Amino acid sequence: DLINDNATRFFQDGWIVVNDLGNSNRAEFIPKAECIKRDIFGKGRFHEFVNQVPHGSRDDTHGCVRMYYRPFLVNGEVPKDLYFTVVDAYKVDKAQKDVTDKHSLYSAQVWMRSNTITPYPNQKLLVCEYIGRLDTMEQNDIVTMGMCLMYNAECCPEAGTGETVSNFIKYKLRRYLMLDPTNANTRKLTNPNNNDYGIVIGDGDKKYNGLR
């Protein structure tokens, strides 16, 4: 089983916390062993990555952050626009203990754009992801904030679902919100000050572009 074979494992599971949230906003990735040592989740436990989607009624839906590739640095900094984050949120808060297989999970993925500066040129790569569900949407969004801070990545949520936009603004991270990329040309011509963050997954071409 390659998933459980440490010799073939190139990813690292752990958790992301944001220190001094709303002020200096410093993100930290904490590997699994360190999470257990520091008792991040209590009772010396660790929440494993959610591999089963859709999940079962008895599955642990807390989840963890899986990092496939660490942020690529140039002169000690992550280049702007090298990465972007996409978020698929849920619509209603529910305590984690009450989540069943009837409820959606939260998903956040960091992608590296095709580029010519990294060891993986001319390809789009998934570099980090989280799947799970915490007690509140805000708690889930804070995990995404940590991803965006670590990878210097703008966040593209599904507009009209969840609280991602309002939570990023609440914690002074508006600069990490991505304007609707499907409206880029229209925005330049008609309303350059339009702040439509994220993508609305609608119907027809709009749905296709949003999913793409």
Where are these regions (language model features)?
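Metal-dependent DNA phosphodiester-chemistry modules and their immediately adjacent helices/loops
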Residues: 171-212
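RNase H-like, metal-dependent nuclease domains and their acidic two-metal-ion catalytic environment used
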Residues: 1-188
